[in-house]
């Protein structure tokens, strides 16, 4: 379902059932459209933000036998666009919703096996999809779509044995800090560092476990990382100048998500298995407070409304 919540009254304002299993959402540049990506039946549906009425339905149909693909990595982009990836098809689609009832779709095929998540850079220029089915990532320059998709980090991990993946990692625009991008390495206890001026590997950082979220503090000074089971009681902080771990924290069992205050002075973390939130000072790394909550998962502050791709 797609649910709209009035955050002032803390009540559900409206809800519509729109698919069998949905995975992500995004809001258009002008705030008038809400897009939802679906595993089942596969595709993206666009709704009017004011009424939650269906505006456009974009089935993720691919191949000669017209199968439906799971859709992941949905983000908003400048120019009333939504970008998303097709897990089963190995494609990236760019949907222009300038005329909402008649979306214009541009498809990029053969980007790699099983894109599992994606990010858009804060300036809205680059869309990067991580690949689960093979090493490397797929890069699309949204300012120069005719150049097509470029493969980056193709040789990372060649010939190496991956560990079992216990939790699918996530890519988000907050993994960008200055001219560097920090991304989780699938099936490895590493964070990859990418030079965004050349889109080549700039380093690898050994970490405590398999990274799930790799998030930059708003000023880009450090990177906070959480991990999949069995290491999901731990957070590590990476200095973006030295590329070294400067702090390891153990907030508790089931650290699932992090969210920074808009200026980065604090980071909120969900500690699901201990039914609480833990808030840390990002300079001293001291715990500021805890808040009781029943099985908290994602944490989303309202400043996201002013950020592309979040």
Would you name each region that the model predicts?
Residues 1-310:
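Predominantly soluble domains enriched in secretory-pathway, periplasmic, or organellar proteins
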